[in-house]
A protein has these predicted regions:
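Secondary-structure capping and domain/repeat boundary segments
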Residues: 1-219
Length: 219
């Protein structure tokens, strides 16, 4: 003011500083809506959980060695921030189900770690009248199939899950051979059968000048 002796009030003007938040995800991905900026007046907010396939998140930390854990940014905080994600590798179990086996056992449970390769235990189950074909994650065979003794990796990414592998079986066909010694048989007589085939009545053979005396398993 040009007026002699006048008092002039000057008012300070302020703008909030904006600070940056850097996340070191160590192989993970940030969740949608993760805050990357804040200011001194931002309300206290919790840090969002990132995701990493095959791993369990163990928290955000202020240091690379992950010794100082942090769960939120409080109102009044200032300065750029850097947070480090800590992860634990997931583990899962594999057990074997005979799925109709008549003998044999595989009681052990294999503990596997995500990211590593393991060899499936060789099958020890038996099923009368059936041939073992392999393993499946579904009892009815409509899941993921694995060969006997196959190298597997990451059957599941879920921590603590037990994966049951079910034995898969196909019916074994047995052949019937007729030693006729010059005779003939009816086309009705089967040339094969399965373990669960209903009782078969064999038709008699025919040979000119001879009377058929029956079928035998030895000569």
């Amino acid at each position: 003011s040009a007026k002699n002796g006048a008092v002039v009030d000057l008012y300070a003007q302020w703008s909030r500083d904006t600070y940056k938040i850097t996340y070191k995800t160590n192989g993970g991905e940030l969740a949608d809506g993760t805050a990357k900026k804040y200011n001194v007046d931002t309300r206290t907010f919790k840090l969002k959980t990132p995701v990493r396939y095959g791993y369990t998140f163990k928290g955000w930390y202020k240091d690379k060695k992950c010794t100082r854990r942090v769960t939120q940014v409080k109102k009044g905080t200032i300065g750029n921030l850097t947070f480090y994600a800590k992860w634990q590798i997931n583990k899962y179990k594999i057990k074997y189900d005979g799925n109709g086996a008549t003998r044999g056992s595989m009681k052990g449970v294999s503990v596997c770690q995500y990211g590593k390769t393991y060899t499936l235990t060789k099958n020890k189950f038996k099923r009368t009248g059936y041939v073992f074909e392999g393993w499946n994650t579904k009892k009815n065979g409509k899941g993921d199939f694995y060969e006997d003794g196959e190298d597997i990796r990451n059957i599941t990414a879920k921590n603590g899950k037990t994966v049951t592998l079910y034995a898969q079986w196909s019916k074994k066909q047995y052949t019937i051979k007729y030693v006729l010694d010059g005779g003939t048989i009816s086309s009705e007589n089967p040339t094969g059968y399965y373990y669960d085939t209903p009782t078969i009545q064999l038709a008699a053979a025919a040979k000119e000048g001879y009377t058929f005396k029956g079928w035998y398993t030895d000569s």
